[in-house]
Amino acid sequence: MLLDDKILDIFGFFRNAIEERIRAVWSGDNIPESLFKRIIVGPPAQPKHGDLYTNAALILGKFDKKNPMELASTLCNAFENIEGIESINVVAPGFINFHCVNSVWHGVVRNINKLGREYGRTDLGHNKKVNIEFVSANPTGPLHIGHARGAVFGDVLSNLLKWVGYDVIKEYYVNDAGSQVKTLVSSVFLRYKEALGEEITIGAGLYPGEYLKPIARDLVEKYGSDLLNASDKDEIIRSFTLSSMLNLIKEDLALLGVEHDVFVSESDLQNRNVIEECVKYLRERGIIYEGVLEKPKREDELSEWQPRVQMLFKSTEFGDDSDRALQKEDGTWSYFAGDIGYHFHKISRGFDSMIMTLGFDHKGYVSRLKAAVAALSNGKASIDIKLYNLVNFLENGTPVKMSKRKGEFLTVRDVIDEVGRDVARFMMLTRRNDVVLDFDFAKAREESKDSQIFYIQYAHARIRSIVRRCPELLAIEKIDFSCVITEQELSLLRLLSRWPSVIKTSAENYEPHTIAFYLIEVAEAFHALWGCGNSDPSMRFIVEGDLHTTSARIYIAIAVSHVIASGLDIFSITPSEEMR
């Protein structure tokens, strides 16, 4: 059986083959597994160096205290019989480059056409449960556009992990027990009076947003003026307003294509004494004590510090830089106590793998949350906290004012109205999540290469167009892909062969933006190959009078469309069948 008939992940195959032969060469020595994790097998930065390379000689040279160039020569001898390798060469300071026979890349076309959109899918997760908490914005107003980046990141990461075999729960933590909710209730009551015809003045510290007016009108419609003197008006307004605000947030998220599986209420956890249970559990394990915190060195933590005896969590025993207070001076639970109780609740629900997204301004919470999860689970559970940075909104390079009028900000609805859901989702993933993102509305609206999602969709639509124009193809089993020999064609096939590795790496590192980068690269490579046909008719996808070459190239195009469609599916973006 030929290699091209059985290998679905080319780079995975070569990595395994190279690692196997390294172990054979060092059969008498114990090479630490950590070294193998540092060995790279992948495409070189410059295609002229070969189809793939490895840094194995450099990594193992340090371990074995041998000259990397000499070690590389030894390894070359061991690698010579790897199936699919045409030639091997060594370059300083010890890199090993490989050139593959063309049939390796031809096999990629066959396999993608056989698997369709399933190409690249793996069972990396083995159905392991993962809890991904994201957005969790305070229910005091509609979603600010700053939340959209975290929403899209969390949603696409959830899709990606599901795609590789994880059992994912998408969760939203409703912060409905803090002082901001009391302020919200006071603000709505004021608007309620206004809806009844009273003149009002919005005091300092209250929420002035126009979005509260419909809630106030709904209260009037349901209760008339009865709430003005009702003893339980605060609880009625609180319950009604939080329900309304949560529905508003869900509607905004739906505009982005985001839907959570579970909403967990902070006040519900408090009413069920979850924090008390958590504190009892930690106290029994000797992880809580009464003491005075040292004065913090960090400026941003000074406002929370008080030189008094209080209930403290031994956070430093679990990697944090300071122990943490669990109660305020008035005896109520601290913000951190609420967080630690919430994660106690997650663990009690059977989650030992958790992911959480936070705005970059919350980076100080990372170490304390990791410490909390380690303490609560006795080191058996883990939490990964992904920080997302700011979004700068621009119009032709000029900053867009975030504040449109008093109390109102650029919202998710505003952005979706401007560019549409698919464009907004993709744009949010065109940079690493922890890097500031420039979102230019003018570029997003363009139907050109400057709009990356348009360029990707255009590639998919072009392919669907040529497939419709050429319905009669030879069966792929009958095609000899040896006619596919130009560098432009082969480089596109090499790129497609990377898709399984891109998926695996993106999922392992929780970095969905790498899929966006890859899809852009695939679209560019396809359009470049298409462009070759403009100057050279023999390079066109449909070659008049040559059904064999035409079929081979259209199967390549179909392979491209499957990969693009798979990537867009992970982004919850519908691939375009035609451009209008």
UniProtKB/Swiss-Prot annotation:
One of its GO terms (cellular component) is cytoplasm. GO terms for biological process: arginyl-tRNA aminoacylation. It is an enzyme of class 6 (ligase). GO terms for molecular function: arginine-tRNA ligase activity; ATP binding. Pfam families: Arg_tRNA_synt_N (PF03485), DALR_1 (PF05746), tRNA-synt_1d (PF00750). Keywords: Aminoacyl-tRNA synthetase, ATP-binding, Cytoplasm, Ligase, Nucleotide-binding, Protein biosynthesis. Its EC number is 6.1.1.19. It is found in: Cytoplasm. A motif ('HIGH' region) lies at residues 137-147. It catalyses: tRNA(Arg) + L-arginine + ATP = L-arginyl-tRNA(Arg) + AMP + diphosphate. CDD domains: ArgRS_core. This is Arginine--tRNA ligase. It comes from Anaplasma phagocytophilum (strain HZ).
